[in-house]
């Protein structure tokens, strides 16, 4: 036997599928349902001061489902015996797998050995014990009583991922007569990853703290703030994805801040700096990125710069994107200058590599990667339908580390959240067209 023979056998099968109760479910119905749910009672995540109903500036933002799209599909090898089991698997959570196998097979946990192999990409995808492939391998191994290798095809993996949750963001704000930002409201409508995985923990408590990360800790000095959350089950499997909810919330926050700066007639960098008196690490990250990017320099027609800053996983990152938008609305990212304050740095090259990887991954989700639902199933199957950023599309990237003696923070995820808002703000600077939906398509610039 070999893998190709198994794949040919799979393709030869004629299966009569039960399409289930969600056969008529599609992306439009999901969007409509989320919009309707947005009017429901929301759970408050943060409230400061007094929020009134007469806020004059409003914007709405949307972020689509997206896949982890790991280069190596899900796979494992398992050997099950009467009193022991041995598993070889690329995973980010070996202890959970060990416990689950022990429970499934009713054998002592000390008799379960999990070998963590090298993995062709994780990004949160390999945090799940039961992505079905391991439990399927166990059931097969029970029956054949021989070691079993189970491999998902790319199509299997793309259609049965645990996707980054889609989300809607409704933001409102007020500026004073002096154009100071005096009130901010952010309502997040999104599925809960934790609520889907452990619904028993959310029977009475409907606030998923993870879902408001990056929103409830808004760094700006605003006297009146309300951040709330509407948990919305879309019936689509969702999971942790690189930077988790920070990628959605940073996009909404930093594009709206840019809109407010424009409304106030203030430079986008200056507008942010004026509201970061209590956030020196945000300020220094912004200052460094802006300085290295040459913020404020004159650019040819059709080119623009945009910036964003965000804190996540104990680190701060600011990014300045420079883009070109052609007369045909084709978008090219020319350069991204990023700063990162991740505390004490042990391996600078490692930090820079992680930041570069985050930017590549962030550009894919900003410009390309989108999962849509048709007839109750994922429409995309492989990289011809779920496109990744290609080598010729990769911009020049410069990474600058903020010197710090603070405790170390993360490096593998904080570089991703600022990517989308920096690019969206740069497109506005180049074209005057606001971007409020991810991923960004050329057709979004045609209206």
Where are these regions (language model features)?
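Cofactor-binding beta-sheet edge motifs in enzyme active sites
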Residues: 1-447
């Amino acid at each position: 036997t070999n893998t190709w023979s198994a794949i040919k056998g799979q393709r030869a099968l004629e299966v009569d599928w039960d399409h289930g109760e969600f056969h008529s479910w599609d992306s439009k119905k999901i969007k409509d349902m989320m919009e309707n749910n947005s009017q429901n009672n929301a759970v408050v995540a943060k409230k400061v001061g007094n929020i009134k109903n007469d806020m004059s500036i409003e914007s709405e933002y949307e972020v689509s489902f997206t896949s982890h799209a790991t280069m190596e599909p899900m796979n494992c090898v398992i050997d099950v015996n009467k009193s022991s089991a041995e598993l070889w698997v690329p995973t980010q959570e070996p202890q959970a797998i060990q416990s689950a196998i022990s429970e499934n097979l009713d054998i002592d946990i000390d008799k379960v050995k999990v070998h963590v192999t090298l993995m062709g990409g994780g990004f949160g995808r390999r945090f799940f014990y039961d992505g079905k492939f391991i439990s399927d391998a166990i059931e097969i191994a029970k029956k054949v009583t021989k070691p079993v290798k189970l491999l998902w095809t790319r199509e299997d993996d793309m259609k049965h991922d645990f996707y980054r949750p889609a989300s809607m963001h409704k933001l409102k704000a007020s500026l004073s007569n002096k154009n100071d930002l005096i009130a901010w409201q952010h309502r997040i409508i999104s599925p809960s990853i934790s609520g889907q995985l452990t619904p028993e923990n959310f029977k009475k408590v409907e606030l998923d703290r993870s879902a408001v990360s990056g929103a409830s800790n808004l760094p700006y000095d605003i006297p009146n703030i309300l951040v709330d959350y509407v948990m919305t089950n879309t019936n689509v499997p969702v999971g942790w994805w690189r930077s988790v909810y920070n990628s959605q919330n940073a996009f909404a926050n930093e594009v709206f801040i840019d809109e407010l700066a424009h409304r106030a007639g203030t430079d986008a960098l200056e507008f942010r700096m004026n509201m970061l008196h209590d956030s020196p690490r945000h300020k220094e990250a912004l200052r460094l990125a802006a300085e290295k990017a040459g913020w404020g320099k004159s650019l040819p027609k059709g080119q623009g710069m945009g910036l964003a800053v965000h804190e996540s996983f104990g680190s701060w990152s600011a990014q300045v994107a420079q883009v070109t938008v052609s007369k045909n609305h084709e978008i090219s990212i020319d350069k991204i200058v990023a700063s990162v304050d991740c505390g004490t740095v042990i391996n600078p090259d490692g930090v820079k590599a992680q930041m570069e990887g985050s930017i590549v991954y962030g550009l894919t989700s900003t410009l390309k990667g989108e999962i849509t639902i048709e007839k109750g199933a994922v429409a995309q199957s492989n990289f011809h339908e779920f496109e990744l950023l290609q080598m010729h599309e990769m911009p020049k990237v410069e990474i600058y580390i903020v010197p710090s003696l603070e405790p170390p923070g993360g490096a593998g995820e904080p570089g991703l959240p600022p990517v989308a808002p920096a690019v969206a703000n740069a497109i506005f600077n180049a074209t005057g067209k606001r971007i409020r939906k991810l991923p960004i398509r050329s057709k979004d610039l045609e209206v």
